[in-house]
């Protein structure tokens, strides 16, 4: 299952505040109707307080979606990996082709998993 095989259906707002926007992109594979949910987060600023607020919003949102949620970085680096792991995402695929022609790692937050969050740095 690669993002390259799927077409965009809709964006669903997870939360938005003055420093962060988080949306869930719903994608569908035309050949069989399979759905893939991809999380997108844009941070205008970074701080431990903003991270805590994002985690609080995520904790309210995640139980409402009974499906796996995927994530991939625009630019893969250790900072992105650390950030996404704060929300329970784990590596799934080291290199998957994406719709824009780039190859990126895919991370997953499994549905109904015991959510484990790393402690927030102060």
Feature locations, PLM:
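Conserved catalytic-core motifs of GNAT/GCN5-like acyltransferases
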Residues: 90-105
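Short beta-strand micro-motifs in enzyme catalytic cores
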Residues: 13, 35-37, 101-108
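Short intrinsically disordered terminal tails
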Residues: 1, 115-122
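Conserved beta-strand-loop-alpha-helix junction that forms the acyl-donor binding cleft
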Residues: 16, 70-85, 97-99
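A short helix-loop-beta-strand connector motif used in the catalytic cores of GNAT acetyltransferases and
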Residues: 3-20, 65-66
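Conserved acetyl-CoA binding element of GNAT-fold acetyltransferases
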Residues: 32-46, 72
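Conserved acetyl-CoA-binding loop-helix of GNAT-fold acetyltransferases
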Residues: 47-62, 82, 86
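A conserved beta-strand-loop-helix scaffold within acyl/acetyltransferase catalytic domains
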Residues: 22-33
């Amino acid at each position: 299952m690669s993002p390259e095989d799927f077409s965009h259906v809709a964006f669903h707002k997870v939360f938005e505040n003055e420093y962060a926007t988080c949306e869930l992109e719903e994608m569908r594979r035309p050949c069989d109707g399979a759905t893939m949910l991809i999380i997108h987060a844009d941070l205008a600023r970074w701080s431990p307080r903003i991270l805590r607020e994002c985690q609080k919003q995520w904790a309210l949102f995640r139980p409402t979606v009974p499906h796996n949620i995927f994530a991939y970085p625009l630019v893969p680096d250790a900072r992105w990996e650390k950030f996404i792991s704060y929300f329970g995402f784990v590596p799934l695929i080291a290199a998957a082709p994406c719709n824009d022609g780039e190859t990126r790692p895919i991370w997953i937050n499994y549905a109904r998993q015991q959510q484990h969050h790393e402690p927030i740095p102060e």
